[in-house]
Amino acid sequence: MKQRLRQYIGEALQACFDQQQLHSGTIPEINLEVPAHAEHGDFSTNVAMAMARAEKKAPRKIAETIVAALGEGGGMWSRVEIAGPGFINFYLTPRCWFGVLDEVVRRGDLFGRTHTGNGRKVQVEFVSANPTGPLHIGHGRGAATGDAVAAVLGAAGYEVQREYYINDAGNQMLTLGRSLLLRYRELLGETIEFPTDCYQGVYVIDLAREVLESEGERLRDLPEEEALRFFANYGGDKIRAGIDEDLAAFGVRFDNWYSEQSLYDRQEVERGIALLKERGLTYEKDGAIWFRTTDYGDDKDRVLIRSNGATTYFASDVAYHKEKFERGFDTVIDVWGADHHGYVPRMKAVLAGLDRNPEDLQIILVQLVNLLRGGQQVAMSTRSGEFVTLREVIDEVGRDACRFFFLMRRSDSQLDFDLDLAKKQSTENPVYYVQYAHARVCSINRNAEDQGVAMPELGEVDFDCLTLEDELALTKLLSRYPEVVDGAAEHFEPHRVVFYLQELAARFHSYYNKGRVLVDDPDVSRARLYLVNCVRTVLHNALVLLGVSAPERM
């Protein structure tokens, strides 16, 4: 709708230039907003005010010239008014609005998909949990956020890759191996004083028991280094497989799994440091090699190579992000836990040091999740190794509720996840409320079939039969969906789609509760059936976009 309106305004401006009524010769960006009050029209533009300086005229005079050149817009609007200092307000005709329904029917599952991204390549890297333990609910929120960000970008016309970065280098894998080895020896009857810096969870004991069952006691006398390597590899492989299974149960699939160790195996870390050295961005102090990140806004410089010769995690992050852009991505998005917020400036510095625009790297921070049961917070303590896993929550409330609830707030705000509410089979449950709207339309369709009311085809509906205010309001809301998708993609905010779904479901339920869709007048029945099935299409498209099902019966 906005696109059509912009086209008419642009044509009117060009006509004004051609007829020497306006003289700047440049059409500015035409912003269209929905006024806060309905009496001010359906859309409003400030284009006249934007042109005032270049035209050296009062905005109202410019607005009068534009309005005179607009004509009737092919029946798109009933009237156009000038308000305040020079706003141009458009009042669209109901017939224009109801044309949106034909577009929904014409595009079907593709309605809401746009070409805004124009095929630009974007990588979204998310979850990337260490393969040292199962995924917890914090990882789950990151998974839902990253997957939904990738989905809305894809719907907006970007070429998207989903990547999981496997942190399989460094001390954490050795710590996992040691934890598993010690639990294995405990199971063999040895008395072990388990170190506090080892992984404490029950899952480590379970893995050790698996090793004992499959390998017996033969690993007891292995040399320490060989034993650690075996248990680290065994534990890492098993946990990685478990992570993959949990993500599959959550409906998340990655296009690429990228190993941190591979950066070392291919000397990418060395090459990354060498490049920074060549550019004069490093220096030596206290036997260590430092990157001058303060040159690019960081609060202090960062170590790349420690005085003992060991590289830092930051060094591998430099190499990893360098390699990402070498793969041809225009934009790279990292989804991190909010506790990594202090890491953002140094990664922006990396891009500047690599002669990339720091804005080519976008970082989405995901805040904590508070699980609630019976109104009380569920205890979670990673120190003791006992924590609520993502799989436990999926098993308790289901994938749909899990994904929807994780996306109900901005990712950078804390989230209270009410387990009791998520399990309710009632309209109190936000995801049930939205899915029920879809199921209700499907029920109407079954009733229509039973009554012999055929589903109208494109062009077979008399929109003059849609006379209720709620019918026009629903149609206006449907027209907004492509814009919601574009906004969610532009700002990396998939919660906008959730908010939209809740608004659309509420509007539909209100319409449904006020009267019948199928009435004695067949033309009215067919028009209403056409409308509610457009609602069903948009509900389906938006739910699927978020990885949530759209059930036909509930």
Swiss-Prot record:
Subcellular location, record wording: Cytoplasm
Keywords: Aminoacyl-tRNA synthetase, ATP-binding, Cytoplasm, Ligase, Nucleotide-binding, Protein biosynthesis
Gene Ontology BP terms: arginyl-tRNA aminoacylation
GO MF, any single term: ATP binding
Main subcellular location: cytoplasm
Reactions accelerated catalytically: tRNA(Arg) + L-arginine + ATP = L-arginyl-tRNA(Arg) + AMP + diphosphate
SMART domains in the cross-refs: Arg_tRNA_synt_N, DALR_1
Family to which the UniProt record says this protein belongs: Belongs to the class-I aminoacyl-tRNA synthetase family.
Protein's recorded name: Arginine--tRNA ligase
Organism of origin: Syntrophotalea carbinolica (strain DSM 2380 / NBRC 103641 / GraBd1)
Gene name for this UniProt entry: argS
